[in-house]
Amino acid sequence: MTHSVEKFLASYLPIGGLAAYSVEFPNAVLVSECLTKSLYPASTAQMLTHVVQVGRTLLSCGEQAAQYCWTFEGHRVHVASRTDGVCLALLVENNPNVQMARVQEVLQGFIDLPEV
């Protein structure tokens, strides 16, 4: 993982309700981490990659950064997409105890990082 991303993520973690995260370049996964024992790490990483890829296809933002969310029965996937094509995907439990303000801070902070 690049030092700037590693330092950035370390400054925000842990976040209540965060089950997994992934940082993805347009053609490669930089890091994928499953933070709960209730999910399989390989399946979780694959799902996050697919959500990011579908988001890139459906919501191509070009020169602008974007944030989007896919909602499932038990989880939500929040994605921050930077103008350089790097994305941060957060798999968050779908319950009222999640620290959503913290999740939003991470997403916006990732978009605002000067370099990845």
Segments (PLM) and residue ranges:
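Non-catalytic interaction/Regulatory regions outside core domains
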Residues: 1-25, 30-116
